[in-house]
UniProtKB/Swiss-Prot annotation:
ATP binds at residues 235-241. Residues 8-207 form the Glutamine amidotransferase type-1 domain. Homodimer. The gene is guaA. Its EC number is 6.3.5.2. This is GMP synthase [glutamine-hydrolyzing].
Amino acid sequence: MSNIHDHKILILDFGSQYTQLIARRIREIGVYCELWAWDVSEAQIREFAPNGIILAGGPESVTADNSPRAPEYVFNAGVPVLGICYGMQTMSEQLGGKVIQGVGEGEFGYAQIELQTTSALFKSIEDAVSAEGKPLLDVWMSHGDKVSAIPDGFVTVAKTATCPFAAMANEEKGFYGVQFHPEVTHTRQGQRMLEHFALDICGCKANWKPSSIIEDAIERLKKQIGDDEVILGLSGGVDSSVVAMLLHRAIGDKLTCVFVDNGLLRLNEAEQVLEMFGDHFGLNIVHVDAENRFLDAMAGEAEPEAKRKIIGRVFVEIFDEESKKCANAKWLAQGTIYPDVIESAGSATGKAHVIKSHHNVGGLPADMKMGLVEPLRELFKDEVRKIGLELGLPYNMLYRHPFPGPGLGVRVLGEVKKEYCDLLRSADAIFIEELHKADLYNKVSQAFTVFLPVRSVGVMGDGRKYDWVVSLRAVETIDFMTAHWAHLPYDFLGRVSNRIINEVDGISRVVYDISGKPPATIEWE
């Protein structure tokens, strides 16, 4: 088996919002990479032994005092280096070039660069050709400062009307700088540039693929766990489901999954989880029906944060009780993924990301004397989904819209009662079913129903009814940091509303939430 970590790229983070996207793009090429703070030590780089280094973008100005710099060793490590945006500017400045502060003439958004010479980074890439016969590329810019003089040994590879050095290269050393962002989809050929860098220039092999990741994870789990037993909190969500399947492959019936039904799940969700993992895949599952315990604990509480804390506390209590029954379990498995491990924090400047020692996702008791098993901690969410498919989990489950940890506890506004949860479950199921029927489910990023603790007058037949109100919510987003409300067709919304009011006894009115994020959040609570 080829070692999937043998060929790898190191990405140094200077604080750009796109840095994780660079890592995901490199992984998509099939090459392993890690994301580290810009102020990493020479010893750490030597130990990691990357085949190439990428200097990512960032919000700082190279011209400012004490702005972040790449470690000098980066340029003496004998491996290719690619500087992106701020990364190009600091490369240029550190190697003897010049950077000037932008004064009202930065480039933000779409731009077209004109290639001036051939380069390994841009081999056989063009979107159009200029009148003079030079290749043109559509790219995405986001910079104020710019390079005004390139270092000795470099050549100008590309320019724009306002940026004389949109790309530079020292082919002999394998140093490249681009002022634009190849990692965003607006740069049409960006992925091909990153492929050229990782595969051709750095010489990496594309070993990082789902089947190899699974093989490697199983081998490492067997080595870590040996003949011990493992306990896992299985929620039915993507991360815990994939962890369950990996562990089942690695250690079989030495895995015990604890599934806690808190009464705050979607319609028939508990039955689906038990059927899929218990009956179909044959995992050892302990089913805890704790609906009354959760609802009793939340009785009378209307404040969202307090509800979240109660739900978290009761889950921990139950999991602790169940883990004590598994006396032989030496390991606790968690669905920690790579973005959980990368945490914005204070290095010397407060401008870097640091790596946590571990991320205790469930907030489990500190006195649980178990080792931690986190087989997904190197993976991004999209990678977790891909290996889930490879492990045989259904597409519809892996690519379902996000569901909050506290479940319906934060989709029932105010106090949570069984009656409200039951009404909400039924209404939400109709909304989701109709989205699938209309082929709209995968065209929105997230859709759900919210129960409002207000009654509204309605008319059914000749009678007057005074029942509850629900709101439909659907959004479109790329990163969930900002979102637009989804412009669903009126006839579709009318159909959903009619079905809910006619089929769910207790709901008299349906409204549609047309708030964007910001100012509103995606979830109501």
